[in-house]
């Protein structure tokens, strides 16, 4: 679950980290009033969406008058911002952040993620701030410096100083950087985060460090113990189908293809998508109904898949272990009866109660294409899409 920049900076303030004074505004009038609270200009105005590349898309601007602030707010509030990280529809701009402009001398990068290979939280820092860190990692990886947090000791000040020296910082900037490093590490661990990015972390012309931007990603599986973060969720920034799936504890990710996939188990779901691609198809989604699937959840999963107008066929691939294949069959039958299906449905059932599930589907009178194996299922669903 991602947070908006203004929400990230609210957290920074709670942990004593330096960030510009700013206010999130939902109307042009609020934006003008925010400027008055901040004081004399110039001011930075930023569209609040869960996507990078806002500046290049016109969603970030430095202005010198309250009239310009009002014009920016009137232009963007209620509109959709399209960046290189969004689809063609963009994301809705419901708030803009008005904050004091910063005199920038140099831009740095500081971020943290969970490194799956080392199973530790890893901090990354670079002198190449203000640009996409992925591009830096690809073209000049030697400019990214890393330290891993020991799960027993947690973050240590010497690690912050080590990164500061590698960035070429001196004097009081080393102390300031170390404080920011320790604060971000504390936020990451205490708030069950999956991602922190300060891009850019800037050195001002006055010689101080300040978090000019902030991107936080929370671990969705840990939100039950982070009620305040859960309240910050902005579902308007999410794919409606993904939000609906989350309410039913379904793991759904929308993709750009035309073959809907319903699978139990994340590994099997990824393998199913791979084999569909191998045979010339394009998955429309990743959907894992999980190990504790019920008839109701399977019905909802089917409805979510069919709500995508791009879907021209559906592949159901179930390996019955914890999930019984006959329950999956009941869910498919229920979904078809409730929603109606105008696209081919290919079903592959293996394992626990597979024969009973297949019999239920056969006796239902529905137009279901039974597959004899995973390869056969992929070939049949691709052929169905192509009209063969």
UniProtKB/Swiss-Prot annotation:
Gene3D superfamilies: ATP-grasp fold, A domain, ATP-grasp fold, B domain, Succinyl-CoA synthetase domains. Pathway: Carbohydrate metabolism; tricarboxylic acid cycle; succinate from succinyl-CoA (ligase route): step 1/1. InterPro entries: ATP-grasp, ATP-grasp_succ-CoA_synth-type, ATP_grasp_subdomain_1, Succ-CoA_synthase_bsu_CS, SUCC_ACL_C, Succ_CoA_ligase-like_bsu, Succinyl-CoA_synth-like. This is Succinate--CoA ligase [ADP-forming] subunit beta. PANTHER family: SUCCINATE--COA LIGASE [GDP-FORMING] SUBUNIT BETA, MITOCHONDRIAL (PTHR11815:SF10), SUCCINYL-COA SYNTHETASE BETA CHAIN (PTHR11815). It catalyses: succinate + ATP + CoA = succinyl-CoA + ADP + phosphate; GTP + succinate + CoA = succinyl-CoA + GDP + phosphate. NCBIfam families: PRK00696.1 (NF001913), sucCoAbeta (TIGR01016). Heterotetramer of two alpha and two beta subunits. Belongs to the succinate/malate CoA ligase beta subunit family. Its cofactor is Mg(2+).
């Amino acid at each position: 679950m991602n947070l908006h920049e203004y929400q990230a900076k609210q957290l920074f303030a709670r942990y004593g980290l330096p960030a510009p004074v700013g206010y999130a505004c939902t109307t042009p009038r609020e934006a003008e009033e925010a400027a008055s609270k901040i004081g004399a200009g110039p001011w930075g105005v930023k569209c609040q969406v869960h996507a990078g590349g806002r500046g290049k898309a016109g969603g970030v601007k430095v202005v010198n008058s309250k009239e310009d602030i009002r014009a920016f707010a009137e232009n963007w509030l209620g509109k959709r911002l399209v960046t290189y990280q969004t689809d063609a529809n963009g994301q809705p701009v419901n708030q803009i952040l008005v904050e004091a402009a910063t005199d920038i001398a140099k831009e740095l990068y500081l971020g943290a993620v969970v490194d799956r290979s080392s199973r530790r939280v890893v901090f990354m820092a670079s002198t190449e701030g203000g640009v996409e860190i992925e591009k830096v990692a690809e073209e000049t990886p030697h400019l990214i410096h890393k330290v891993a947090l020991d799960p027993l000791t947690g973050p240590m000040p010497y690690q912050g100083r080590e990164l500061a020296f590698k960035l070429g910082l001196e004097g009081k900037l080393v102390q300031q950087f170390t404080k920011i490093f320790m604060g971000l590490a504390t936020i990451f661990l205490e708030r069950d985060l999956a991602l922190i990015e300060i891009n850019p972390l800037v050195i001002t012309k006055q010689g101080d460090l300040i978090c000019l931007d902030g991107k936080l990603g929370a671990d969705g599986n840990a939100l039950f113990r982070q009620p305040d973060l859960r309240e910050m969720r902005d579902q308007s920034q999410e794919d409606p189908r993904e939000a609906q799936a989350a309410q039913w504890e379904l793991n759904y990710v929308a993709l750009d293809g035309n073959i809907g996939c319903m699978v139990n188990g994340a590994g099997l779901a990824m393998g199913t998508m791979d084999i569909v691609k191998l045979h010339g198809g394009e998955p429309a989604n990743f959907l894992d109904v999980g190990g504790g699937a019920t008839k109701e959840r399977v019905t909802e999963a089917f409805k979510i898949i069919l709500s995508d107008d791009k879907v021209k066929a559906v592949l159901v691939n179930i390996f019955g272990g914890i999930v019984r294949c006959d329950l999956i069959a009941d869910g498919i039958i229920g979904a078809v009866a409730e929603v109606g299906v105008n696209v081919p449905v290919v079903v592959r059932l293996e394992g626990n109660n597979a024969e009973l599930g297949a019999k239920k589907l056969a006796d239902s009178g529905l137009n279901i294409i039974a597959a004899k194996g995973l390869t056969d299922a992929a070939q049949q669903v691709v052929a169905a899409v192509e009209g063969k």
